[in-house]
Amino acid sequence: MTETETASQPLIQQLPHATRMSYRIRRGEQGVLTFEPYKSALLPLWRFRTLPIAQKSAADLWQKFEAYDVEGDFVGMDMTRKFIQMGMTRAKRYANHAGGRKYRKGTREELPKSEGHVDKGEKEAASRVFREVWLRCREHEGYQRRKRAFLEEQRVWDGLEGGKGGAASGRLLRST
């Protein structure tokens, strides 16, 4: 198969089954920047610097979410949901903390929230844009159906592979 043919295939068809089964839903955004090839496919779409940029980013990510649904790719849908959620939380962090720094450098001491910095309103609006799309993802019928099917397939896979964790060992993690 040529590189062009591979690039035109849906990601789910490029991913070995064992790799797909190694994906864990996890809480919130965990794992979003580590699971390839989805990270590389979605990261260029993820932006939140201004409200228009956030609106375009959220729309582009929603379009990918729906495309993954058509392809029957739950992992792609969930990774897209995580990027959308990350857009919401990062924009909110920049709304709450000028410059986006939440903790004092080198410590886990939380810095006070800033009240009136220049970008506060725009970052809050960007966060709301992503939140609306994130809620659509969570409530999406195809997402819910594919999530149940993926978790069941993963439970069976984990059982066959000797209980390598996740569903087979009783550590199912809810998606938020």
Sequence positions of predicted segments:
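C-terminal-biased regions
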Residues: 2-62, 82-176
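Amphipathic alpha-helical protein-protein interaction segments
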Residues: 54, 70-73
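Inward-facing hydrophobic residues that define packing positions of alpha-helical scaffold repeats
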Residues: 74, 80-81
